Design a protein with these regions (language model features):
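FMN-binding flavodoxin-like domain, especially the glycine-rich phosphate-binding loop
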Residues: 2, 7-14, 20-49, 53-174, ...
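Iron-sulfur cluster-binding cysteine motifs and their immediate structural context
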Residues: 186-187, 192-214, 218-220, 224-241
């Protein structure tokens, strides 16, 4: 079984590819409502998620803390998608798994096109770079699937990058404290009230009121609404002005 969370779509694509190769069931964590999930005694459990500010998204860590499984997983691994580096995600993820009395056996990162646009200095990749990343990701998924099938243990293959401790244990808490807000989101006059942002929000945090999107209080900063808007009418304060959108489907299927 593979539990996944995805905002813009990169992690959903990776999780789908991985599930097909491993013949595993795919479960979106946003559909979890506290029910007992039945797994086999020897079942392998995977977690797939994007990296937000050099750590797993809070929604994924909350899910790990709350999910009720019928048996202790025999084998646990994670695959995270990121624009470049993960910080100390392997260490942080493993600590949350251990807090449940479980053991994480393996972890991987996969570089995917950048999607974060809600801060100065961050933006999407050029199309050529995005395409290269997706091609490389396809090959990496093949490698990861083979290693997971072999039940490889005590194996972490993540690009932590420089200043990993500082990024994960200093910057990320600040990000979670100050940036997980939808308040700066607004729409320009280009908005036509199509509702695609509402349909795309992975945590159902957007409603359409009087023909315009209204954001709730549970934003994860995935920025899916920004990227999906066909009019490019959604902005986040002054940080997204003039920035380009990213949509995975433009680069698929791979040729």
């Amino acid at each position: 079984m593979i539990f996944y969370f995805s905002g813009v779509g990169n992690s959903a694509w990776v999780a789908t590819q991985l599930a097909e190769k491993l013949a595993d069931k795919l479960v979106s964590i946003v559909d979890y409502a506290g029910q007992l999930i039945h797994i086999q005694e020897e079942e392998r459990i995977g977690f797939v998620f994007p990296i937000y500010s050099w750590a797993p998204p809070k929604i994924m860590l909350d899910f790990i803390a709350q999910v009720q499984l019928s048996h202790t997983p025999a084998y646990i691994y994670f695959v995270c998608t990121c624009g470049a580096d993960t910080g100390k995600t392997p260490e942080l993820f493993s600590a949350h798994i251990q807090a449940r009395g479980w053991q994480c056996h393996a972890g991987y990162s996969i570089a995917m096109p950048n999607t974060y646009v809600a801060f100065p200095g961050f933006g999407v990749d050029k199309d050529s770079i995005a395409q290269q990343k997706i091609y490389a990701a396809k090959e990496r998924i093949d490698l990861i699937a083979k290693q997971i099938q072999s039940n490889i243990s005590n194996h972490y293959d993540c690009n932590e990058g420089g200043l990993a401790n500082f990024k994960t244990y200093t910057i990320n808490p600040l990000f979670c404290q100050h940036m997980l807000s939808a308040n700066p989101f607004y729409t320009t006059d280009a908005c036509v009230g199509c509702g695609k942002c509402q349909e795309t929000c992975p945590i159902h945090n957007i409603t359409i009121e009087n023909g315009r999107p209204s954001w709730g209080e549970h934003c994860t900063q995935c920025t899916a609404c920004f990227h999906i808007c066909p009019q490019n009418a959604i902005q986040y304060g002054r940080f997204t002005k003039g920035k380009k959108q990213y949509q995975l489907h433009r680069f698929l299927p791979l040729k």
